[in-house]
Amino acid sequence: MAKNNSTPQKLVITGIKGYQRFISPLLGSNCRFTPSCSAYATEAINRFGVIKGGWLASKRILRCHPLNDGGEDPVPPIKKSK
């Protein structure tokens, strides 16, 4: 659905890539999930667009804390309309 890579999408993805390249190495690998939260955010935004993908990524980041065991948590598939 949102695979057209609009300008807002490109800006957000560029910000995430910047985080992955420059900030994440300084913080170390702390994500409790697979894929990492930043990889999840990139995939969700590419799949669903900035609004819905950003919402999914925000919910995921809020779950990434020491009280959560983490584990495998892929981006949900696009639901096909009937």
Curated annotation (Swiss-Prot):
It is found in: Cell inner membrane. It comes from the Bacteria. It is a peripheral membrane protein. SMART domains: Haemolytic. One of its GO terms (cellular component) is plasma membrane. InterPro entries: Membr_insert_effic_factor_YidD (IPR002696). Keywords: Cell inner membrane, Cell membrane, Membrane. Could be involved in insertion of integral membrane proteins into the membrane. Belongs to the UPF0161 family. HAMAP family: UPF0161_YidD. This is Putative membrane protein insertion efficiency factor. It comes from Colwellia psychrerythraea (strain 34H / ATCC BAA-681).
